[in-house]
Amino acid sequence: MTKKLHIKTWGCQMNEYDSSKMADLLGSTHGYELTEIAEEADVLLLNTCSIREKAQEKVFHQLGRWKALKDLNPNLIIGVGGCVASQEGAHIRERAHYVDVIFGPQTLHRLPEMINHVQGTRSPIVDISFPEIEKFDRLPEPRADGPTAFVSIMEGCNKYCTFCVVPYTRGEEVSRPCDDVLFEIAQLAAQGVREVNLLGQNVNAYRGETYDGEICSFAELLRLVAAIDGIDRVRFTTSHPIEFTDDIISVYEDTPELVSFLHLPVQSGSDRVLTMMKRRHTALEYKAIIRKLHNARPGILISSDFIIGFPGETQADFEQTMKLIADVNFDMSYSFVYSARPGTPAADMVDDVLEEEKKQRLYLLQDRITKQAMRFSRLMLGTVQRILVEGTSRKSVMELSGRTENNRVVNFEGTPDMIGKFVDVEIVDVYTNSLRGIVVRTEDQMDLRVHESPSSVIARTRKENEIGVGFYQP
């Protein structure tokens, strides 16, 4: 009988990427088949996130549900990973003694050994260490799941913003070797992936070693990824303004594969609040980056993150945030009311903004950005947009659906052979959450760049350095 694995994932795109790697890894080592039904699984894994409020309580609530399954099947293995696991460690078992495996974001590659340990000894195991980049050399070859894919290029963050747990849960910044990243993307391109999203907690701080011992900057990596034949759309998430240098901005001038959409978190428009957050930049410096981006790529749309009601935030501070939103004209945002994260410097500050005031400010901010986004959508009416066709429409199986560079969903009439390819469509209707288009050009009528074939990248010889980190030499 096939053994089943169920993974529940909360949080960021990095967690989604990690969960996909867990599934691939345990599929290759133990033959586990992924299931959406927890009740039929032999192994249950919870990949957690500590960003949102009451993250720990959410974890224990879910584990309580799984305890009932463990009572019915004592051989069931329950594991907790991700950032809450990294924060709480063995303390998780103090409240949930039935948890068998506790692992951090940097030790998911050791899951096969951990599961073997539990099965062989009937005793729990905890591993929340930070073995730097080792995990990427222990993971199986990537498997494409549609025309888009996430690829992690670095982990951790050195910025230590006062509100953020990332440096404590994922460690400091470590970049994957450049050729390791290119090899993974080439493998995905050979399987039909057309769009890659490069991931990192501070992705534009990437500085990966090359096969000859040099350092590849993030700007250089973007150009190398875009040069792989078949990869015709490149995104990246998430960036920090103080690392958004002119050499990265210049890529927008000469690399058409890099999308005209950027997520660049600012958190607040108040310099006073930015200082308390230890963001190391001002609102004016942020706007200077945006101006340079618009000069390099006219029409680029910007999204951001905002924390509302940070300790000490006044009405005047909030009004400065609203002014920044109007000045930059953000297209979308991930915005939340502030809640303290245990172990961060901000958790020791007096949380003096009333909860109702936080919620009111959040409503005003989100309403402003929603209206701005709708204006951008209406401006697309009558224009021709290039979309990557991802599959059938959620609205009708008789139609197809894809996304524009600026992440708008477009539904249109098409043929199944268009799935996984690019088409140009004229936007004929604008709705709140989607657009409607008519096909005007198919991929065989486009002049997409061809530079380096995936096979030429894959053909590189794999080597390991003195600490066992893999790289690929031409």
From Swiss-Prot:
<keyword id="KW-0963">Cytoplasm</keyword>
<dbReference type="InterPro" id="IPR013848">
    <property type="entry name" value="Methylthiotransferase_N"/>
</dbReference>
<dbReference type="InterPro" id="IPR006638">
    <property type="entry name" value="Elp3/MiaA/NifB-like_rSAM"/>
</dbReference>
<keyword id="KW-0408">Iron</keyword>
<dbReference type="GO" id="GO:0005829">
    <property type="term" value="C:cytosol"/>
</dbReference>
<dbReference type="GO" id="GO:0051539">
    <property type="term" value="F:4 iron, 4 sulfur cluster binding"/>
</dbReference>
<keyword id="KW-0004">4Fe-4S</keyword>
<dbReference type="GO" id="GO:0035597">
    <property type="term" value="F:N6-isopentenyladenosine methylthiotransferase activity"/>
</dbReference>
<comment type="similarity">
    <text>Belongs to the methylthiotransferase family. MiaB subfamily.</text>
</comment>
<dbReference type="InterPro" id="IPR007197">
    <property type="entry name" value="rSAM"/>
</dbReference>
<feature type="domain" description="Radical SAM core">
    <location>
        <begin position="143"/>
        <end position="375"/>
    </location>
</feature>
<dbReference type="Pfam" id="PF01938">
    <property type="entry name" value="TRAM"/>
</dbReference>
<feature type="binding site">
    <location>
        <position position="164"/>
    </location>
    <ligand>
        <name>[4Fe-4S] cluster 2</name>
    </ligand>
</feature>
<feature type="binding site">
    <location>
        <position position="83"/>
    </location>
    <ligand>
        <name>[4Fe-4S] cluster 1</name>
    </ligand>
</feature>
<comment type="function">
    <text>Catalyzes the methylthiolation of N6-(dimethylallyl)adenosine (i(6)A), leading to the formation of 2-methylthio-N6-(dimethylallyl)adenosine (ms(2)i(6)A) at position 37 in tRNAs that read codons beginning with uridine.</text>
</comment>
<feature type="binding site">
    <location>
        <position position="161"/>
    </location>
    <ligand>
        <name>[4Fe-4S] cluster 2</name>
    </ligand>
</feature>
<dbReference type="Pfam" id="PF00919">
    <property type="entry name" value="UPF0004"/>
</dbReference>
<dbReference type="InterPro" id="IPR005839">
    <property type="entry name" value="Methylthiotransferase"/>
</dbReference>
<keyword id="KW-0411">Iron-sulfur</keyword>
<feature type="binding site">
    <location>
        <position position="157"/>
    </location>
    <ligand>
        <name>[4Fe-4S] cluster 2</name>
    </ligand>
</feature>
<protein>
    <recommendedName>
        <fullName>tRNA-2-methylthio-N(6)-dimethylallyladenosine synthase</fullName>
        <ecNumber>2.8.4.3</ecNumber>
    </recommendedName>
</protein>
<dbReference type="InterPro" id="IPR002792">
    <property type="entry name" value="TRAM_dom"/>
</dbReference>
<dbReference type="GO" id="GO:0046872">
    <property type="term" value="F:metal ion binding"/>
</dbReference>
<dbReference type="InterPro" id="IPR038135">
    <property type="entry name" value="Methylthiotransferase_N_sf"/>
</dbReference>
<keyword id="KW-0819">tRNA processing</keyword>
<feature type="domain" description="MTTase N-terminal">
    <location>
        <begin position="3"/>
        <end position="120"/>
    </location>
</feature>
<keyword id="KW-0808">Transferase</keyword>
<dbReference type="InterPro" id="IPR020612">
    <property type="entry name" value="Methylthiotransferase_CS"/>
</dbReference>
<keyword id="KW-0479">Metal-binding</keyword>
<dbReference type="InterPro" id="IPR023404">
    <property type="entry name" value="rSAM_horseshoe"/>
</dbReference>
<feature type="binding site">
    <location>
        <position position="49"/>
    </location>
    <ligand>
        <name>[4Fe-4S] cluster 1</name>
    </ligand>
</feature>
<dbReference type="InterPro" id="IPR006463">
    <property type="entry name" value="MiaB_methiolase"/>
</dbReference>
<keyword id="KW-0949">S-adenosyl-L-methionine</keyword>
<dbReference type="Pfam" id="PF04055">
    <property type="entry name" value="Radical_SAM"/>
</dbReference>
<comment type="subunit">
    <text>Monomer.</text>
</comment>
<feature type="binding site">
    <location>
        <position position="12"/>
    </location>
    <ligand>
        <name>[4Fe-4S] cluster 1</name>
    </ligand>
</feature>
<feature type="domain" description="TRAM">
    <location>
        <begin position="378"/>
        <end position="441"/>
    </location>
</feature>
